[in-house]
Amino acid sequence: MSYVIDRRLNGKNKSTVNRQRFLRRYREHIKKAVEEAVSRRSIMDMEHGEQISIPGRDIDEPVLHHGRGGKQTIVHPGNKEFTAGEHIARPQGGGGGGGRGKAGNSGEGMDDFVFQITQEEFLEFMFEDLELPNLVKRHLTGADTFKTVRAGIANEGNPSRINIVRTLRSAHARRIALTGSSRALLREAQKELARLKVEEPDNFTDIQEVEQEIERLKARINRLPFLDTFDLKYNLLVKQPNPSSKAVMFCLMDVSGSMTQATKDIAKRFFILLYLFLKRNYDRIEVVFIRHHTSAREVDEEEFFYSRETGGTIVSSALKMMQEIMAERYPASDWNIYAAQASDGDNWNDDSPICREILSKQIMPHVQYYTYVEITPREHQALWYEYERIGEAFPDTFAQQQLVSAGDIYPVFRELFQRRLAT
């Protein structure tokens, strides 16, 4: 039986290249549709594909044709209604389109072209041109650590790693292959010798010749070595990179009593989008979740998004905890440190200057990028204005934006993490 091994990268999906070419050609249409989908979807529902509609007029191929100017004289066979010199009116409406117009009895057109993009394609367009700013300290953590793992069988290796079973199996197969014809001749000679001894026991000449042939064949088979260097098989051990994280993102969320349920929902949606962005685009990043009201606490992902704990408001408690964790686990000399903070701006009045002091002296000199989003439809309060002073002192590594509704999340997110041009 014959086997066909398909080693093509696309496998059975032979249209992958054409699909990628199509996505590149209509990138602007798809990107616009993805942005509209993000604005109407729940952030929790981002990991799905999307149905894209492209106007029919935009998928027409360019062709060379005669212009509409000039004069033409055409004779139409069977023409009983018009005479030479009369003008033929254009067909009336009724062309194809979105389907919202009234019915027509003439004209033609083309419906919009609708197709589906996959989850991976949707996320690619969603996070296109986004990145963590100032990611520059990749080399400071030193060489990656490695772990030794089994990687199959090799023909060369350390004698201490010889695989006895595979070696003997290979030697046995080699002997069978190389002595197959000799063994077949030996069996025939042994049958012939048995026949001669029964039927012609006095034919000593032929019996002696057959016995000599048998001895010669046995000697040929025995000359083949039991074990050859070709048979040796070794367990292959390779070093697999076990990379350490190069970057850490601190997520600080205000869960105080001043945060309404709608405000908390917007904050959670923002952090879910951020978490999805980090996990998709960066394999080597750690995320630290900090919730705070009057006191701050480091929590896991589940508790960060779904805990119902609440209380008063002291924002500096979260900043102090972040600074402590940085000093203990993430030295700035080895890590790219990022932070995203979400709050409604309400804070104990005497605490806002403390926040600015902690940020400007203990955090901002060590982070690559710090972003603050304030979720409020009202006028800004003291915390916003204190943070504005931080932005003036650190214009390249600090950014702040305001969120009013859930529809602002994606545009603000793109504004905060838009890819910067190298300077």
Swiss-Prot record:
Question: Compositionally biased, Gly residues: which spans?
Answer: 92-107
Determine the domain of life of the protein's source: Bacteria
Outline the segment boundaries, as ranges, of region: Disordered.
85-107
What family is it from?
A: Belongs to the UPF0229 family.
- Which HAMAP family does the annotation name? UPF0229
Stated name of the protein: UPF0229 protein PputW619_4806
Q: Which organism is it from?
A: Pseudomonas putida (strain W619)
